[in-house]
Amino acid sequence: MMQKKLLLIVSIILNLVFTIHILYYSSTTWNPTWTNRAAAEAETVASFSCSGHGRAFVDGLGVLDGQKPPCECNNCYIGKDCSVLLKDCPVDANSGDPLFLEPFWMRQAERSAILVSGWHRMSYIYEDGTYVSRELEKVIRKLHSVVGNAVTDNRFVIFGSGTTQLLAAAVHALSLTNSSVSSPARLLTSIPYYAMYKDQAEFFDSAHLKFEGNASAWKQSGRNDNITQVIEVVTSPNNPDGKLKRAVLDGPNVKTLHDYAYYWPHFSPITHPVDEDLSLFSLSKTTGHAGSRFGWGLVKDKAIYEKMDRFIRLTSMGVSKETQLHVLQLLKVVVGDGGNEIFSFGYGTVKKRWETLNKIFSMSTRFSLQTIKPEYCNYFKKVREFTPSYAWVKCERPEDTNCYEIFRAAKITGRNGNVFGSEERFVRLSLIRSQDDFDQLIAMLKKLVYHEEDVPSENFMYI
């Protein structure tokens, strides 16, 4: 009898030990199964240095044939490892690729990484029947709250494939707000303006919309009759000159669309939280991820929101679920410390570039840069300079009528002022590309300014 009791007790104890061991092992140790290959592949490709002048990517050429992805070199660098710099290579200062933030994200490799399963959200819609990730909507509202650049209360949040799609959706929605008017709505903006506004209006060639151009000229003309439906696009900070803008037009016939793609601490003092009826923002100028093609809008009026939403559904059936997951992870990193790391890095980087640029142009009598008075920034809690994405350069000599061609002859490709509705005496130079691009731009600018008649060569020694 005692022997049976002992055996029973031993059996119970062993079962308890095994149960505790299994529970403890399961809760404290986890071994990945299906993620091993993908993680190893990503880590391997990320380890390719490409001499610091390029990047390798998991979707690079040759991977389908079992080859290692090649280094994709920065502009003016060549070779298998991007180690060879081409002499007198033309500089690309045209594109607004925000690669200046790439070093920040490389430092955040672990926090920003995601691994997507092959069956991730295969449905068209989320559980609530929409095309919108509610978690992403929440983190976007939090982002604006911590930065203090926009009011999100009592606003609908709409997603699009970049602000390019949202711009088309917004203009479409606003042009349909008064169907009783037979003539098309006029699309207006301030000069210099972002060319996409004109390009989209003319490309879609809608019976409901006509690009008219300069808002100030319209206001002073006899056509400003308070009857013709008008849509004014206000870009603030402005592209190309970086200045804060306000609406020029008002009246019962005027609808205003605000493009705040550049209203982030990288580029501008955050002077106040904007509180508009319709505002657009872009991931590309927030985190630098232009290739993700993601933007969002804050819309006060439900009817306008519904028209925009219908436009998005009919043209793309929402934004990719993988994109929304990626953006969610990126913005979680941003808001995790109130944006301090990324905005301090971004502002510091662009500020240094402007300091270098100003030193060069201060020696020139042939070229001048835009000037913007410093303002108090509520985000950084100090008065600070504007640090725009672009240099808006003016050729001052009477004979220099085409500034773009003058810079192109100096092997600097900018963007012609006439693209922005302005004079050809202006050219836009991008300051937000990679450090390699900026270094090459500075080298070419030194040569250009150096050849001015009245600039002593010793002035360049400390730039």
Curated annotation (Swiss-Prot):
Secretion signal span: none
What InterPro entries does the record point to? Alliinase_C, Alliinase_N_sf, EGF_alliinase, Ethylene_sulfur-biosynth, PyrdxlP-dep_Trfase, PyrdxlP-dep_Trfase_major, PyrdxlP-dep_Trfase_small
Q: What class of enzyme is it?
A: transferase
Stored Gene3D superfamilies: Aspartate Aminotransferase, domain 1, EGF-like, alliinase, Type I PLP-dependent aspartate aminotransferase-like (Major domain)
Task: Tell where it localizes.
Answer: Membrane
Under Gene Ontology molecular function, one entry of this record is: transaminase activity
Q: Give the transmembrane ranges.
A: 6-26
Annotated Gene Ontology cellular component terms: membrane
Q: What is its EC number?
A: 2.6.1.-
Q: Which Pfam families match?
A: Alliinase_C, EGF_alliinase
Q: How does it sit in the membrane?
A: Single-pass membrane protein
Q: Where does pyridoxal 5'-phosphate bind?
A: Y124, T163, T164, N239, D259, Y260, A261, Y262, S282, L283, S284, K285, R293
Give the modified residues of type N6-(pyridoxal phosphate)lysine.
Answer: K285
Give the record's keywords alphabetically: Aminotransferase, Membrane, Pyridoxal phosphate, Transferase, Transmembrane, Transmembrane helix
What does the record list as coiled-coil region(s)?
none
Q: Which cofactor does it need?
A: pyridoxal 5'-phosphate
Q: Which family does it belong to?
A: Belongs to the alliinase family.
Question: What the protein does?
Answer: Probable aminotransferase.
Q: What is this protein called?
A: Tryptophan aminotransferase-related protein 4
Q: What is the species listed in this Swiss-Prot or TrEMBL entry?
A: Arabidopsis thaliana
Q: What is the lineage of its organism?
A: Eukaryota, Viridiplantae, Streptophyta, Embryophyta, Tracheophyta
